[in-house]
Each structure stands twice: as structure tokens, then as C-alpha cells.
Amino acid sequence: MNTFEMKTAIHFGADALGRLKEIPYKRVLVITDPFVVKSGMIDMITKPLQAGGKEFDIFCDVVPDAPVGKIAEGVKKFLQYQPEAIVAVGGGSAIDSSKAIREFALKINNYGKVGLVAIPTTSGTGSEVTSFAVVNDTEAHVKYPLISESLTLSLIHISEPTRPEPIS
């Protein structure tokens, strides 16, 4: 017998991002990298949140390999904003950073439950469906694994498949 089981619900397909307006949280912290904001991709996230009447703020200082200093900045933002959920937008670094920020903020503040939604923009790391995250101490040149069931996304993971448009 074989079994496959996941805590993470995966929503995908046409207009999957539109379902962001339906998430059961009113106050959301979007965590992403500067490119997502500068390129305008962030609008694909913020428009559905606005349509659903969600309040949101954006932390867009994620860099590759989740350095401890950036995680600390994200924790500070989290504690100031006090979201009901995090929406992680990006690749493995953005998702790992979001997991670490949430985990440390909840430990510091004994805050309770905070939802975590991932919108992967790359494929390969699987961070959106694992109970792991990696934090990089650049001064000590050490990467620390975080391993906890609380790092598993329990709400939803949204993928929006696209295909190349024909060139006219």
C-alpha cells in the first residue's frame, strides 16, 4: 500500500491568484524580494487582496539564502504590523524567509496562529510544501536548518501556470 499525505492545500489553475481575495484573514503581510515589486508583479497579489477588502503591508527586502540580518528586519516588521497571515511571494528564499520570520516572531511574542500562504514564482525548492527552512549566518559562514511542523503551510499554496504568448 502507498500513501501520500500533505497538510498544504494546493490551489492552481486559471485565476488561482484571484482566490487571494477569499483567504480568511483581514490583515496580511506580503513578504517578497525587490524584483517582484519593481517589476510590477506585486500587482497580481495586491489587486486580489484589495478586491477582498484585505489590509496589507509589504516587506520586500528578501535576498537569496535568507541571511539572519534580513530575517531580523522581517521579524521587526511583523511585530510592528501584527498580521493575521503572511503571503510569501517568490522562490525558495522568499518562502524560507517568510517561514523563519513567522516562526521567530511567534516565539518572541507568543502571538498565536498566523496563516501562511505561498505563491511560488520558481520551481524546484519545494519550500512551499515542506516543514523546513534555511537561515544563513553570513558572518559565521553557517547555514542553519529550521525544522518544525509549524513551518508547513497549513492554508494554501497558489500556483498560476502560464504559457508563452505567441509573438506576432
Each language-model region and where it sits:
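ATP/NTP phosphate-donor binding region
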Residues: 1-85
